[in-house]
Swiss-Prot record:
Disulfide bonds: none annotated. It is an enzyme of class 3 (hydrolase). One of its GO terms (molecular function) is ATP binding. SUPFAM superfamilies: Actin-like ATPase domain. This is Actin. It comes from Magallana gigas (Pacific oyster). CDD domains: ASKHA_NBD_actin. It holds the Pfam family Actin. GO terms for cellular component: cytoplasm; cytoskeleton. Keywords: ATP-binding, Cytoplasm, Cytoskeleton, Hydrolase, Nucleotide-binding. It comes from the Eukaryota. Its EC number is 3.6.4.-. It is found in: Cytoplasm, Cytoskeleton. It catalyses: ATP + H2O = ADP + phosphate + H(+).
Length: 376
């Protein structure tokens, strides 16, 4: 879609990162942290053109003097004032568009409370004056991006993980499972186990350093116990990382102990099942006739599925739970970090989708509840 003058906007608001761009593009134009920062001390930033708040990368780069807040927790918006700041920043600073000129497709977590989708709808029409909008479920978009309409999506981002069985394009709500265990918890856990090694990471700014260590050095072991044995008997798994101040730290078994919590939440003191068992439970809640199609199409999505080794481990664990003759296939698309956004870009540019938008006129006639009738 060359004519950006009318291109729809696609905005995927995640707990950790916001992905935004134009429908029809193959990747988001803007990817920035879903953070709003406010100065810790009034007046400390003399001459820096004191603003009362910073969003995204700017908040990230000035993190040393700001208190950082994430308005989206566990995939669900909890702070609407800050969320509005993020949307404002998305339209005006990142995409540089006038929101009143473009339809906008937003994404939501599965099982998002009804009041939340109404609030999103209200803000788009009343604050930003959107001509049209739509709210789509994140996991469904990821499945579209993989070229399928049936499968089970394990979507794991920064704030929440979900297993969402989808049949012929429709999510099956009774079988959706939510796991409040995702990237941010793994970052916190890595902070904790690095402290046991004698390194101290505590502030919100230091957490960002640990997140970087996690993204660069962590991986999922195919056999956890065996990997622990290897790590104990040799230094072959050790890697070093240089901190911003030049200090070099070494990390060993932490590299795979951190993401292991996705399979063994008991590491974090949680009683829930791991992602493999949660996926299996989701499949078992579905009609017996479609399970075979789900087992053969387990699609990984979201940044927390980017750990090397996760697909093989998932394949191994689900195979152990499933009936012995069942064909199991775990699909890990290389672009899965952005597959929700990509699915949104595909959906919003389909000619058949154009009648699905909620128009400003429909909103004015029916109010925010229109979203439940038109988006499902």
């Amino acid at each position: 879609m060359g004519d950006e003058d009318i291109a729809a906007l696609v905005v995927d608001n995640g707990s950790g990162m916001c992905k935004a761009g134009f429908a029809g593009d193959d990747a988001p134009r803007a990817v920035f942290p879903s953070i709003v920062g406010r100065p810790r001390h009034q007046g400390v930033m003399v001459g820096m053109g004191q603003k009362d708040s910073y969003v995204g990368d700017e908040a990230q780069s000035k993190r040393g003097i700001l208190t950082l807040k994430y308005p989206i927790e566990h995939g669900i918006v909890t702070n609407w004032d800050d969320m509005e700041k993020i949307w404002h920043h998305t339209f005006y600073n990142e995409l540089r568009v006038a929101p009143e000129e473009h339809p906008v497709l937003l994404t939501e977590a599965p099982l998002n409370p009804k009041a939340n989708r109404e609030k999103m709808t209200q803000i788009m029409f009343e604050t930003f004056n959107s001509p049209a909008m739509y709210v789509a479920i994140q996991a469904v978009l990821s499945l579209y991006a993989s070229g399928r309409t049936t499968g089970i999506v394990l979507d794991s981002g920064d704030g929440v993980s979900h297993t969402v069985p989808i049949y012929e394009g429709y999510a099956l709500p009774h079988a959706i499972m939510r796991l409040d265990l995702a990237g941010r918890d793994l970052t916190d856990y890595l902070m904790k186990i690095l402290t046991e090694r004698g390194y101290s990471f505590t502030t919100t700014a230091e957490r960002e350093i640990v997140r970087d260590i996690k993204e660069k050095l962590c991986y999922v072991a195919l056999d956890f116990e065996q990997e622990m044995t290897t790590a104990a008997s040799s230094s072959s798994l050790e890697k070093s990382y240089e901190l911003p101040d030049g200090q070099v730290i070494t990390i060993g078994n932490e590299r795979f102990r951190c993401p292991e919590a996705m399979f063994q939440p008991s590491f974090l003191g949680m009683e829930s099942s791991g992602i493999h068992e949660t996926s299996y439970n989701s499949i078992m809640k579905c009609d017996v006739d479609i399970r075979k199609d789900l087992y053969a199409n387990i699609v990984l999505s979201g940044g927390t599925t980017m750990f090397p080794g996760i697909a093989d481990r998932m394949q191994k664990e689900v195979t152990a739970l499933a009936p012995p003759t069942m064909k199991i296939k775990v699909i890990a698309p290389p672009e899965r970090k952005y597959s929700v956004w990509i699915g949104g870009s595909i959906l919003a540019s389909l000619s058949t989708f154009q009648q699905m938008w909620i128009s400003k006129q429909e909103y004015d006639e029916s109010g925010p509840s229109i979203v439940h009738r038109k988006c499902f």
